[in-house]
């Protein structure tokens, strides 16, 4: 025992750690090795940019091509895979979507309820809450959903969809959905990312159709938000994002 203590007295902390029994092969970096030194300022800058871009692209901001956030796109993709014309329990849809979305069942359930309350892409059954009174939806095991006929007609087309591997590489998921309709304007979008946020107000379905026809004819058109719960807006600076 005394011999072991004497041997350890001349060791550096790194050598002491390496000499201890461990189940890990990890070896601490040598503080005298210049190549192993990481400056805090550089680490913060690089890692923060990685984190910010991930939140922007993978969590909070909708894609302009289909108007959907990743969780919304994965929900619709899962519902299309499950679709047999009948209603599915929301809890079942949430569980299926977790194959593609690695951020927990709560975020999937909340996003699904928000999509259902817009009454555009999802045909709902049960107590889905009320946007006029602020009442919450019932628990996922009590409410049901299926894709609406509008969604089946305008959102999906496997032949024109670009695919990528899911987060664990076990499944394929769409990069964006080939939506035939300006869904971003119809649903609106709101998300807070890192360094930026998005807030696009919803628009009236009939106004969007009229504007699309005029656009295809090369005619001028004006289109302004329309609030499902009512309200008024000063649109004098709307085109400037204010």
PLM-predicted stretches and their roles:
Residues 1-241:
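Catalytic phosphate-handling regions of large nucleic-acid enzymes and associated NTPases
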